[in-house]
Amino acid sequence: VRSGPRHAGRGGPGPVGYAVLEYTFFEQGFLTLLTVAPCARRQGVATRLVTAVEAECATPKLFTSANVSNQPMQRLLLAAGWQPAGLVHGLDEGDPELFYLCPPEKRSRSSTLRTFPDTVIGKESRIRTPLGTL
């Protein structure tokens, strides 16, 4: 399993949000996890994390998904300009998964890491197993 950059939003004494970018979705970028502490929500942390992931992604396409029940994530993605890309039933019983695609024009801009110095980037890693490096 190959793990991509991790982004942490900082506020006050420590991290208040976390995002994980992986390249396991048809070898394209996929925002697999985005979470913000309840005390830091509605303060732009998630938007800054999504912007950092957009800037960091090294593949031509960047996707993410959210359950139909996850209205806050859907609003965030639509406000950030992401486009609906599909719907999958059966992953979570009774709660279909909506997939979103980051538009290419959002990905071609210069890195926003200088704009958001509170974003911390992790290193890409590989896992060694008895069967070889993944």
Predicted features along the sequence, with ranges:
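Conserved acetyl-CoA-binding loop-helix of GNAT-fold acetyltransferases
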Residues: 36, 42-55, 75, 79
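Acidic, Ala/Val/Gly-enriched low-complexity intrinsically disordered segments
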Residues: 118-120, 124
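Conserved catalytic-core motifs of GNAT/GCN5-like acyltransferases
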Residues: 63-65, 81-99
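Conserved GNAT acetyl-CoA-binding A-motif
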Residues: 56-68
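Conserved N-terminal glycine/acidic-rich loop preference
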Residues: 28, 71-89
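Short, intrinsically disordered C-terminal tails of secreted or membrane-associated proteins
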Residues: 126-133
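A short, internal acetyl-CoA/4′-phosphopantetheine-binding micro-motif in the GNAT/acyltransferase core
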Residues: 33-41, 66-68
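Acetyl-CoA-dependent GNAT
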Residues: 1-33, 37, 50, 90, ...
